[in-house]
């Protein structure tokens, strides 16, 4: 919205700054951060009054989780409000890619909110029906994939870009939209599975998002794209503003989610943020790189898949408990120890993912 102030510029004054993505990204970051700081406590107090008993704790979970009883959930609302306000104020609203990612984020947030609401009202860990969640998420992801394919340059529409290889594309044809559904749904649910300890999910999400802000800026700039040998996707640089707002809102949330958490993100936040990462990967044509940058989420999701399949086949478990962060809890690792080590892993994987920009 504030980008339109450039119409008041004569080319050398303050209003000219609004032309620059980096300036507006900084504005979006601080807007979202301050929103999170100032409105975090009032939101937590409101959630505590409305939810009374807070998020239900599983009886079969790690014993130390029983001390978290009464902690309110749906804290993802704080991140979502902050990033939405930051994006609407500072991003170019005539950019279709921004709207795709923002609407995917809010769509998955709505699914998560309904799920959290069901859990809180029934005081049971089983919320919204899995089939309903899957169906709505599939529709949102399919619409996003189709919109991205329509907006992409003709030479890239329906194509899958391969990292490490210059100008390597695989034409997916009619399989492109189903593939984008897999990416977006997979990312949303993987982040959702990771959100099981105080502060565990939000930092890796911000790290992955920061990595994709660099990717979006590079592939959206013809000079950088040509230098790095990546595919040029005009307009994606504007997603750096969205990501900056996400990180600002995420930090504001982490202020209250740091151990011991005063509020949980809930499915409201985890599904939304995962969906956002998936949508950004699709828009920037770096879907495979997301599996590297977000490798921590992949491992968490795979641990659940392996556990379920192995148990159905043998009646035994591979892990003491899945997702894998609970396995380490059962082995005696402290919560802070697990969280910080997973943050370190997320940072290392993000750096490896960014290296794919040049290694080709």
Swiss-Prot record:
It comes from the Bacteria. It is a multi-pass membrane protein. One of its GO terms (molecular function) is UDP-N-acetylmuramoyl-L-alanyl-D-glutamyl-meso-2,6-diaminopimelyl-D-alanyl-D-alanine:undecaprenyl-phosphate transferase activity. One of its GO terms (cellular component) is plasma membrane. InterPro entries: Glycosyl_transferase_4, PNAcMuramoyl-5peptid_Trfase, PNAcMuramoyl-5peptid_Trfase_CS. Its EC number is 2.7.8.13. Pathway: Cell wall biogenesis; peptidoglycan biosynthesis. It is an enzyme of class 2 (transferase). Keywords: Cell cycle, Cell division, Cell inner membrane, Cell membrane, Cell shape, Cell wall biogenesis/degradation, Magnesium, Membrane, Metal-binding, Peptidoglycan synthesis, Transferase, Transmembrane, Transmembrane helix. This is Phospho-N-acetylmuramoyl-pentapeptide-transferase. The gene is mraY.
């Amino acid at each position: 919205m504030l980008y339109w102030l450039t119409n008041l510029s004569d080319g050398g004054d303050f209003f000219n700054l609004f032309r620059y993505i980096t300036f507006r990204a900084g504005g979006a970051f601080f807007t979202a951060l301050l929103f999170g700081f100032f409105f975090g406590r009032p939101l937590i107090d409101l959630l505590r009054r409305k939810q009374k008993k807070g998020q239900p704790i599983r009886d079969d979970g790690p014993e130390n989780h029983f001390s978290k009883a009464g902690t309110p959930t749906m804290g993802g609302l704080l991140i979502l409000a902050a990033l939405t306000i930051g994006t609407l104020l500072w991003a170019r609203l005539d950019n279709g890619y921004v709207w795709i990612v923002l609407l995917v984020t809010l769509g998955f947030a709505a699914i998560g909110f309904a799920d959290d609401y069901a859990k809180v009202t029934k005081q049971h860990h089983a919320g919204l029906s899995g089939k309903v969640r899957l169906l709505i998420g599939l529709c949102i992801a399919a619409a996003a994939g189709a919109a991205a394919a329509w907006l992409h340059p003709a030479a890239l529409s329906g194509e899958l870009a391969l990292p490490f290889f210059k100008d390597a594309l695989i034409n997916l044809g009619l399989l492109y939209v189903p593939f984008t559904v897999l990416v977006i749904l997979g990312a949303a649910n993987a982040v959702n599975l990771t959100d099981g300890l105080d502060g565990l999910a939000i930092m890796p999400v911000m790290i992955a998002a920061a990595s994709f802000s660099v990717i979006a800026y590079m592939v959206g700039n013809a000079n950088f794209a040509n230098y790095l040998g990546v595919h040029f996707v005009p307009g994606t640089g504007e997603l750096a503003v969205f990501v900056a707002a996400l990180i600002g809102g995420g930090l504001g949330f982490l202020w209250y989610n740091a151990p011991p958490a005063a509020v949980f993100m809930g499915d409201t936040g985890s599904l939304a943020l995962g969906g956002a990462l998936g949508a950004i990967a699709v828009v920037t044509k770096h879907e495979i790189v997301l599996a590297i940058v977000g490798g921590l989420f992949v491992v968490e999701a795979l641990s659940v898949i392996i556990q379920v399949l192995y148990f159905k086949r043998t009646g035994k478990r591979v892990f003491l408990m899945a997702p894998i962060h609970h396995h380490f809890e059962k082995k005696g690792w402290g919560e802070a120890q697990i969280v910080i080590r997973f943050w370190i892993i997320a940072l290392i994987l993000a750096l490896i993912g960014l290296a794919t920009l040049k290694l080709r």
